[in-house]
A protein has these predicted regions:
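Bacterial c-di-GMP phosphodiesterase EAL domain
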Residues: 2-112
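Short glycine/proline-enriched coil/turn segments at helix->beta-strand junctions
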Residues: 82-89, 111-116, 143-145, 167, ...
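EAL-family c-di-GMP phosphodiesterase catalytic domain
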Residues: 1-22, 26-28, 33-37, 46-52, ...
């Protein structure tokens, strides 16, 4: 079990019997490059040290269990629901295995009365044909929640196995694609041709960090995310 403490500036401290961690909840926009509009936000968590420094959040989240991840997701829903300034929907990160938990699914649906939140699966850590997971995904989608595959790249065999099994609403293309293929229209066209049939609403390409990459991506009907548009921000500090 975890206890939660709130502090000024949008920071949240989560405690267990033996340890605690302070998180700052951030939002990073997802754009439609053709018109420059923000379509969604992705919710991210930054780990804060006792001295107030930002630590390596990616390394931290690789060491924690599903219960903590589920707690963070529900806290993010509560946190961002306090703001009236966010008109776009928000994507929340979770492991696929967390979607086995019926009580967790029920909590998400109950908290999503505004139909503002969607689920981004950032790690496939359990068999994709798990009957309970597939049932719960359909339940979430029936309630209006999108299910998004994160960090797709051609060498991710587990992600490949999910295509055609999980009915993805969006697929996010890992930032490594742009790193090695910026300007290669044939490569991007081939990717779109192969992957698009496996998602209902389209692709989101990550890692847009330069003007050149943005100009390359905006020729296509893709959503995009990256530091070129914005770094993750604390919207409560911004306002």
């Amino acid at each position: 079990m975890f206890t939660v403490e709130y502090s000024e500036g949008g920071r949240t401290t989560i405690r267990s019997e033996r340890s605690y961690v302070t998180l700052e909840f951030l939002l990073q926009p997802i754009y439609f490059p053709k018109n420059g509009q923000t379509v969604y936000y992705e919710a991210l968590s930054s780990v804060i040290s006792d001295s107030g420094e930002h630590l390596n959040s990616e390394a931290f989240f690789e060491t924690i269990n599903d219960e903590f991840i589920k707690t963070v997701l529900l806290l993010q829903m509560e946190h961002f629901s306090q703001s009236n300034s966010i008109s776009q929907d928000i994507l929340l990160n979770v492991n696929l295995s967390s979607l086995k938990d019926d009580d967790f699914i029920e909590s998400i649906i109950k908290r999503n009365k505004s139909n503002k939140y969607h689920i981004e699966v950032n790690e496939i850590d359990t068999p994709v044909r798990d009957v309970k997971i597939l049932k719960n995904i359909k339940r979430l989608q029936k309630s209006g929640i999108y299910i998004i595959l994160d960090d797709y790249y051609h060498e991710n065999e587990i992600a490949h196995l999910s295509l055609g099994v999980i009915d993805w609403d969006y697929i996010k293309i890992d930032k490594s694609f742009l790193l090695y293929n910026s300007g290669n229209d044939d490569c991007l066209k081939a990717l779109i041709f192969v992957i698009s049939p496996y998602c209902k609403n389209g692709l989101i390409i990550e890692g847009v960090e330069t003007y050149f990459q943005n100009e390359f991506v905006k020729k296509y009907n893709l959503l995009a995310q990256g530091y070129y548009y914005s770094r993750p921000k604390n919207i409560f500090k911004e306002n």
